[in-house]
Amino acid sequence: MDAVNIEQIDQEITLNLQSIDSDLSYCFNKITKDIIPYVTRYGQTCEDITNSSSWLKEMFQQSANVQLVTDQAVESAGQVLEPRTSLFPEVENETDEFHTVDQYPALSQTGVSSAGAPTTKTGGSVKQDQFQDQDTDELTQDSAMEKQRKKRKVSLQIHQHFNSSSSSNSSMENDISANSSPIKTIPPETETGTETHNKIQGELAKPGTVIHFNSKRD
């Protein structure tokens, strides 16, 4: 009985060792064929990323080496600082123009300030040039309006002239047509009466009379 049990146990151990060996071989094949290639490609990708971002590393290192020189450090070293140029123009208090009555200088008759006005290349002040430009603009506008008024007046006169001439021509034509008519009207007898009017009435033929004309025959 003991020998049978020993052989049975030996067989079971052998079977278990074989299963373990097969499992180990499977794991080895899985690691070498599937896992190691992926790890290799991952390492290569990481190396490429590191090489590509190396310039960032150098940039940050160089920026860390920058030394900012302050005014106190320069003064302690005995150097004289030059005045810094400002981006904004400086405004003098004398030329400030605020909306107050006291700070405006006296104005002359032409409306130009007599003092404190900036001058131009021609010698006049800027405000004076501005007022002169405004005056010239107003003069040009006035002259243009005056020209338009004159044109309207001339056109109105021409229109009236042609209307009056047409009316006089029509009246003259009416008179000519009336005088050229073959039938002449005789004015009625006035209350006082004149010899000329009676003579004209006597010369007129009465209705129903026959008028004979002398005709010469060859």
Curated annotation (Swiss-Prot):
The alphabetized UniProt keywords are: Cell cycle, Cell division, Centromere, Chromosome, Chromosome partition, Cytoplasm, Cytoskeleton, Kinetochore, Microtubule, Mitosis, Nucleus
Bias (Polar residues) occurs at: 109-131, 172-181
Stretches the record annotates as Disordered: 109-218
Q: Name one GO biological process term.
A: protein transport along microtubule to mitotic spindle pole body
One GO CC term, this protein: mitotic spindle
Has UniProt tagged this entry with the keyword Ribonucleoprotein?
Answer: no
Output compositional bias ranges, type Low complexity: 182-193
Classification via InterPro entries: DASH_Ask1 (IPR013964)
Enumerate the subcellular locations listed in this protein's record, separating them with semicolons: Nucleus; Cytoplasm, Cytoskeleton, Spindle; Chromosome, Centromere, Kinetochore
Tell me, in a sentence or two, what this protein's role is.
Component of the DASH complex that connects microtubules with kinetochores and couples microtubule depolymerisation to chromosome movement; it is involved in retrieving kinetochores to the spindle poles before their re-orientation on the spindle in early mitosis and allows microtubule depolymerization to pull chromosomes apart and resist detachment during anaphase.
PANTHER family from the UniProt entry: DASH COMPLEX SUBUNIT ASK1
Partners and quaternary state? Answer: Component of the DASH complex consisting of ASK1, DAD1, DAD2, DAD3, DAD4, DAM1, DUO1, HSK3, SPC19 and SPC34, with a stoichiometry of one copy of each subunit per complex. Multiple DASH complexes oligomerize to form a ring that encircles spindle microtubules and organizes the rod-like NDC80 complexes of the outer kinetochore. DASH complex oligomerization strengthens microtubule attachments. On cytoplasmic microtubules, DASH complexes appear to form patches instead of rings.
Homology family: Belongs to the DASH complex ASK1 family.
Mind telling me what this protein is named?
Answer: DASH complex subunit ASK1
